[in-house]
């Protein structure tokens, strides 16, 4: 077993920089507008999906990192961009986590991808507790 380390790998640093650029160039300039509009920021989520930041593939890759650091680094950079827009981009993960934690393999395979849709047909996962 490898020794625990908080040092980021070259791949993790590349992901961090990639997301930071998206947050700086797309999220920060748009944050106030979407906050003022009080609407869901579909264009921002669509931009995230176009570059591969919003989608099941990104989440699966980030969550399968053995060091456990890729997803927290990604989330930190997204939320550096803006917390509200970050929730719009990362929010489907809550529904996906509920399904993954409690669903059968068949349910997971059917429903988790539907929490995200595709870059051309974006979907949102919703989480309800009663």
Predicted segments, located by residue:
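Short alpha-helical functional segments enriched in proximate histidine and acidic residues
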Residues: 22-30, 118
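A short, structure-level motif marking secondary-structure boundaries and short turns
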Residues: 4-5, 16, 28-31, 60
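Intrinsic disorder at enzyme termini
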Residues: 1-11
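Short low-complexity stretches enriched in small and charged residues
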Residues: 10-14, 51-54
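A non-catalytic, amphipathic alpha-helix used as a structural packing/dimerization or gating element
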Residues: 11-25
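Glycine-rich flavin
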Residues: 32-130
């Amino acid at each position: 077993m490898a020794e625990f380390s908080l040092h980021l790998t070259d791949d993790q640093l590349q992901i961090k920089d990639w997301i930071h650029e998206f947050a700086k160039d797309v999220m920060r300039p748009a944050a106030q507008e979407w906050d003022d509009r009080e609407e869901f920021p579909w264009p921002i989520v669509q931009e995230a999906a176009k570059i591969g930041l919003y989608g099941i593939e990104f989440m699966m890759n980030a969550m399968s990192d053995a060091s456990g650091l890729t997803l927290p680094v990604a989330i930190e950079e997204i939320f550096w961009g803006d917390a509200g827009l970050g929730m719009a981009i990362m929010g489907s993960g809550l529904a996906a986590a509920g399904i993954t934690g409690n669903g059968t393999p068949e349910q997971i395979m059917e429903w988790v991808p539907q929490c995200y849709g595709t870059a051309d047909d974006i979907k949102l996962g919703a989480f309800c507790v009663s």
